[in-house]
Amino acid sequence: MQCTWRWGIAAGLVSLLLALPLKAQAQDGKKEYNLKPVTQERLLKGTDDPSAWLMYGGNYQSWRFSPLKDVNRQNVKNLRVAWMFQTGIPGQLEASPVIADGILYLTASYNHVYALDAETGEPLWKYDHPLPDDLRICCGPTNRGVAIADDKVFMATLDARLVALDRKTGQVVWNTEIDKYTNGYSSTVAPLVVRDRKSVV
């Protein structure tokens, strides 16, 4: 069973990348991205949109299942690498990427966030969260991903903070303390947006 669901996720993400529409070119030759707000309606529909993977588990039930059928048992052997991105950060890569409006958002160990063109892998922006020198990490420096909602990207950090970034630029919108890292608190989880309560958990 474990192998089956992993293949399902892999096939779904590859199908998702293949299904992404081409973006228009701006006058300066750069791609233009039509960043629509990630509304509660979009989040509730989960994987209904074949061009998006809007949260860690795909939907609020965290099924991690994609209904796309482009990749199957017969043609999976024909897949080839479309692009590759290396973070350059030591440690494990345990994050599940999220995709919205042609942009893939990914985290690496030590709280680095990347926005990549989902079609080409081209880096669009990067955020490096400053960690304190006296940080005590109990169980490794991994981060398991981001949440997106409206025009923001959310990440929980090793020093027990919740950071909101602008989806378009990667600039910090706000940065708030969850608890005191000096008391041993930390967070590696991918946040979840609970819109009816207007909160990020």
What label would you give each PLM region?
Residues 8-19:
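Bacterial N-terminal signal peptides
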Residues 28-87, 122-135, 171-180:
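Aromatic (tryptophan-biased) beta-strands that constitute blades/sheets of beta-rich domains
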Residues 85-96, 126-150, 175-190:
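Extracytoplasmic beta-rich repeat domains
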Residues 198-201:
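Conserved small/polar residues in nucleotide/adenosyl-binding loops
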Residues 55, 106-107, 155-156:
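Conserved beta-strand element within WD40/beta-propeller blades
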